[in-house]
Amino acid sequence: MPAPTCFSCHKTRAALRRPRSGQALCGSCFCAAFEAEVLHTVLAGHLLPPGAVVAVGASGGKDSTVLAHVLRELAPRLGITLHLVAVDEGIGGYRDAALEAVRSQAARWELPLTIVAYEDLFGGWTMDAVARSTAGSGRSRSCCTFCGVLRRRALEEGARLVGATHIVTGHNADDMAETVLMNFLRGDAGRLARGGVLGSTGEGCALPRCRPLQFASQKEVVLYAHFRHLRYFSEECVYAPEAFRGHARDLLKLLEAARPSAVLDLVHSAERLALAPAAKPPPPGTCSRCGALASHKLCQACALLDGLNRGLPRLAIGKGRRVLQVEPPQPGNPSLVTSDPVAPAGPCTCKQPKDKANPCGNGGDRAGATCVSQCDLSPGNGEDRAGATCVSQRDLSLGNGGDRAGATCVSQCDLSPVAE
């Protein structure tokens, strides 16, 4: 049976049938329709006003490559200026090749490119160093948890560096649907409320962010790259298999097989989601350390870096460890963290006996935990794992060993198990 004629131009043989509409289109007409839909998304959502300086998050992958190409085609009509911003996470054997793809794209399309590195922004930390630090620590957070938070912060810093007024990322409809599923499964009402919004800021980000490909399926993104002959980096990150997103992706595939419109249905549902007043998160404040938008005392980036710089996992009980010193941000210093050794704790002033039969109960510590200094653990910092260590006055909301949000240590305290 011969291929049908293109539904749009009625001249050329159709090369595909669009999953969304069922229309048979040739490659040229499909690309034109794809670009028109992205233009409609931007204009209808008032995402990029004329005169905007747009930082395009460029990873070298298919989504950011297609986004940069489409916006370059639409830039004269939108009246915007584009600047590619790439993030070097410090993943050996993976990121170097991806950055080469980004450099090639920037040269081919004559777009300015700025690369910002975790190592420069975050006190020497790279993702490989984070992976080594957290390996075997018993933490529930995957490398992708750290990378997602730090990458958003790095992209924000890169955008500020180039004088951007807006940030765009290449999240497609499948990415958005996976995020909606993840937030439902986690019961994260705050992120559910933000998840379907085309333009938003989010924690740690003051510049407006938007996702022009939010309604474009992953299949159509790949098809656009194919028909436009776009070259991109297609290898998966070495840390991706451990991410929780993979479970949401598998579930989404099952849903899509039973209901082809499931992806867009989830995206539109998130857009229309209305939370009860009691479930709505409070308006964001500012991070006490770096000044970024934050829903707690510390923004997510500073809190994660705080935990990393405390030296977990510890090599042995009682060994020295590096910790984060709580200092106000210094003008002109691009690093978010500084590390220094902490002085040993003072003599124990805890009034309760410290032995296995009658362990220290200051704050509800586990049997066997020994308090070696006065410490107020009233919000629940008594569920610490063996080896969790509070080292100075700070908010432990991110959980040094599983602490609840709001737990604040007011003095040095070692919660290691009692030695034999």
Swiss-Prot record:
The alphabetical list of record keywords is: Cytoplasm, Phosphoprotein, RNA-binding, Transferase, tRNA processing, tRNA-binding
Q: Name one GO cellular component term.
A: cytosol
Q: What positions are modified (Phosphoserine)?
A: 200
Q: Write out the pathway annotation from the protein's UniProt entry.
A: tRNA modification; 5-methoxycarbonylmethyl-2-thiouridine-tRNA biosynthesis
Compartments where located = Cytoplasm
A Gene Ontology BP annotation from the UniProt entry: protein urmylation
GO terms for molecular function, please? nucleotidyltransferase activity; tRNA binding
Pfam families under this entry? ATP_bind_3 (PF01171), zn-ribbon_14 (PF16503)
Reported EC number(s) for this entry are: 2.7.7.-
Q: Does the keyword Lipoprotein apply?
A: no
What this chain does, per the entry, is described as: Plays a central role in 2-thiolation of mcm(5)S(2)U at tRNA wobble positions of tRNA(Lys), tRNA(Glu) and tRNA(Gln). Directly binds tRNAs and probably acts by catalyzing adenylation of tRNAs, an intermediate required for 2-thiolation. It is unclear whether it acts as a sulfurtransferase that transfers sulfur from thiocarboxylated URM1 onto the uridine of tRNAs at wobble position.
How this chain assembles, per its entry, is:
Component of a complex at least composed of URM1, CTU2/NCS2 and CTU1/ATPBD3. May form a heterodimer with CTU2/NCS2.
Q: Which family does it belong to?
A: Belongs to the TtcA family. CTU1/NCS6/ATPBD3 subfamily.
Protein name from the UniProt record:
Cytoplasmic tRNA 2-thiolation protein 1
